[in-house]
Amino acid sequence: MPTLDLDLALATARRAVEAASGAALAHFRRGVRVDLKPDRTPVTIADRESEAAILAVVRAAFPDHAVLGEETGAHAGAAASRWIVDPLDGTRGFTRGEALWGPLVALEHEGEVVAGAMALPVAGEVYFAARGRGAWLSTSSAAPAPLRVSGVPRWEDATLQLGEPSVLLAPPFAAPVERLATACARTRCYGDLAGFAMVLTGRAEAWIEAGVKIWDLAPMKVLLEEAGGRFTDLAGVPTVASGDCLASNGLLHDHVLAALAPVASRP
C-alpha cells in the first residue's frame, strides 16, 4: 500500500476549505433559497457549491481516496483513506446573515484523522493541522502562525464555550452544564465551529458539543491536539465519531469530564 503523503494531505485540506470559503462567500447575505433535507435540516446552493469545490480539490490531489460528504454522501475509494466533509457548518446562521460559519475538512487514514482544516470565511481565518506538523492559523493579513491553547489551570478563571443550546440546555445535559457554567469566569455560546475556534486559539478553555454528526467534528481532534489541547467525547474516549465532544486546553479536561459523567454513559 502506498505511503500517505501527509504534507500533500495538509496542503489539500487547506486548499479545500479555502475553495469552499470562496464558493460560500459568493452567496453570503444574498437571499439564498433554503431547502429542507429529509432530516429537516436546511441546505442551500452555498452548501452544495462549497461541497463541490472541496471535492474538486480533493480529487485533484487524491483521486483514489474515499469521501464522506454531508450533502453528497459516501463516495467509494481506497479503503485506507477517507475525506470527511462538512461544506458549511452553521447553515442556519449563514441564511440569517450571521458571520460564524465555515467549512470543515478532514482526512482519515487507517481509522485515524491525520490532517484537517476549517475556516471562518467572513473573518478571513483558515485553521489547518496534520499529525506531527503542528496546528496553524492563516489570516487574510498575515502569514501562517502556530496555534497554541491557553495555559489557564483553574476552572474559576476559565471561559466555557457551549455548542448547540437546544441540546445542552435541555435534560439531561442542563443540570451539569449549568453547574459548570456558573462556576467558571464566563460562558459563551458562539455556535458551530466558532466556539471550538476559541479554544483552539487560546481564547477559551473548554467547548462542549452534543447531538452532531461526524462531519461536524472531524478535523477538530487533530487540530486541537497539535495545538497542545485535548479532544474526546463526553465519555472521555478520543474520537470524533460519537456525536458529542469536549475540546479543552488539556489542563481542565478531567474536571469537565467529571462534571459531565452523569450524562456521558452510552447504551
PLM region spans:
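N-terminal subdomain of lithium-sensitive/metallo-dependent phosphomonoesterases centered on the IMPase/IPPase/PAP
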Residues: 1-88, 252-258, 265-267
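Residue-level signal for inorganic ion chemistry
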Residues: 20, 24-27, 47, 58, ...
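Short secondary-structure boundary/capping segments
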Residues: 33-35, 59, 74-76, 118, ...
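Generic detector of well-ordered alpha-helical packing
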Residues: 48, 52, 71, 87-90, ...
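DPxDG-like acidic metal-binding loop motif
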Residues: 77-136
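Short loop segments at secondary-structure junctions
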Residues: 108-112, 122, 131-134, 140-141, ...
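An extended, acidic
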Residues: 148-267
